[in-house]
Amino acid sequence: GNGIKKSFNKEIEDKFAGTLGSASINVKGKYANTAAIGDATTAIGTLSEAYGTGSTAIGINSLTKGVASTGIGIMTRSWGTNSLALGTQVGAYGDRSSSIGDTNQVGLDMKDGSKSGKESAAVGSKNTIYGNQAYAIGAGNTIGSATVMTTTEANGSGAGADQDKITTVTDGTVKGNMSGAFGYKNSITADNSYVVGSNSNVSADGAMVLGNNASVTAKNAVALGNNTKVDNESAVALGTGSETAAAVATPSATINGAVHNFAGINPASTVSVGKAGMERTITNVAAGRISDTSTDAINGSQLHAVTSEMDKGVAYAGDVKAASATANKFTRKFGEQTNIVGGVTDPTKLSDNNIGVVSNGTDTLNVKLAKTLTGLESVTAGSTTINNDGLTV
């Protein structure tokens, strides 16, 4: 009746508290300025206000604007539909977003009137998420980037109304979608990227970081280890302090005068296990395939097999051995010199085409004298000499 209406209006006038929506609950304390304004809303505490239909604001200066949103704590803000803000000075602005802890912000006002931070969550302290479907667990993490401006908006009614600083995206673009940061003071300004560690930075899409003080500036790159750095697309840095460099193609090499073409001549990127001055060995590598088309890594035992065969050298054998020799054969290793001595050292006193070398097709070369000798100046056999002047006995 009129008595109830007057009493209700008197409560609003005296306490700056109200229950304006249907099926709403307003519970006030000694310093209440609490308002459950939307339909089916609940506001409990001091300076708390529930605007969104089915929303709940509990605590001190908590504000819920989103439909079915919940804000519990001190200075919580739940603006997104089905959003949750739980803690102290936390904001859940995106639809179905969650902000739990202390001084977290999830989402922004977009230029078109929508909100970023959809289905994102921050748990911990001083985390900021601009992107959609992004997650931050820890402290001081930042996911996403945007060109923003800050305005001031009054919230609430009566003398207890407060003012919120509203961060608005001015260019309509937000990075940091579907990304995640777990740790302390990590920064991600890219989509589909993840960081686990502390003080690491990712500024390229599709990147992965596991470590502290790491940096990734190239797409689809991976950094594993502390103080790693990846600046090349699709590259991988493994181990503390590792840094990547641009991949270098090696199509062929000339060995002993012969050109050998290689497989895998168009590398997509590179894997680094150190940096200049801090190189590492790679151990426990399985034997790779050996062929003209193989791109497998080769381990030390395979190289040993090659060098051990080369160390065997080449064996040379004669029909007989010299009186001072122990055998009629000897072995020379790769790079060692073999001397073949005929006796005559003046090339002008040598003939041509009087000796032939015949192979048996397996392992023997036979040196034979021509049946018809040409280009000779003289032939001496014992005391007999044949030359251009005739026969001398």
Residues of each region from the PLM?
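Low-complexity, small-hydrophobic/phenylalanine-enriched stretches
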Residues: A121, V271, I282, L303, ...
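Short, solvent-exposed secondary-structure boundary motifs
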Residues: K118, A223, P251-N266, A327-S351, ...
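Low-complexity, glycine- and small/polar-enriched segments
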Residues: K5, N9, E13, G361-N366, ...
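Extracellular receptor-binding modules and their adjoining Ser/Thr/Gly/Asp/Asn-rich linkers
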Residues: D311-L365
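Extracellular repetitive beta-rich solenoid segments
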Residues: P267, K275-A305, S351, S359-D363, ...
